[in-house]
Amino acid sequence: MKRILVTIAALLACASTSQAANYIEAEVLKQAFIQKKTMIVVDIQPAKDFAQQHLPGSIETNAFPAKTTDEKRRLDRTLATIKGSTDPVIIVCPRGKSGAKNSYEYLLSQGVAEERLRILEDGIAGWPFKEYLTQGK
């Protein structure tokens, strides 16, 4: 019984670590735009969705859902910009869920410091400030 409890505790510790991520609320990000704070916005939406709406200055990667090796490699085009800066990195996906977490984990694995990474809470679908959205590429 003791061995089972230790195993369960170890599994829970691993699960909580892999699910941890830093989030940024839409209002906080809006204020950063207003204050013209520098940041790197990595948008993983599919190309069609990105063309319909995205945040200004976003780097289009079309990496969603960032599950496969090919999808994750699409994030590589952001690495030179990210590593050449100390700015925060905001990951934007359709809903701020698994695709964003997959991207977050991939960027971590590529040496991006966790304290720089943020996921837009609720993704572009939850972004309430439509006046800050851009259309087209």
Predicted regions span which residues?
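Sec-dependent N-terminal signal peptides
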Residues: I4-A15
